[in-house]
Amino acid sequence: MRLLVILIIPLVFALNSCSKKEENNDESNSSSSTSPTLSDNATSYTVTVSGGKYFLDGTQAKSLKFKKGYTYYFDSSDSSTNSHPFFIGTTSGGGNYNGEYTSGVTNSRTTTGTLTFVVPSDAPSTLYYNCGNHSGMGGTITVQ
């Protein structure tokens, strides 16, 4: 009986220490409070459209917080995005491509693919995601 207790106590401490480490990693790796983390510096969003608004991971006009040097993916493969070219800009609104921001951006204006954004070190502190065809669909990106 004593041997069993002696073996169980270190096991309990080891398991407790692992769960605390995982909790700490979850908080420090998050670039957005509700976005799934792909790795330490890459996050993906699923883009859909409903009622004339962009939804990112099911949330309408979601405000985002990005970090310089990190990579962000916007998957616009859902059929609801077919007539809504997704792009990143320096001005809010949309409905045109005025202020389109292309530094670090791959596949801008996509309607069926994935826009990739590697945030450059000289990115403005505020950007926006917009639709090139319609105004008022997007949201704000704060760059830190």
Task: Go through each PLM region and give its residues.
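Sec-dependent bacterial lipoprotein signal peptides
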Residues: 1-16
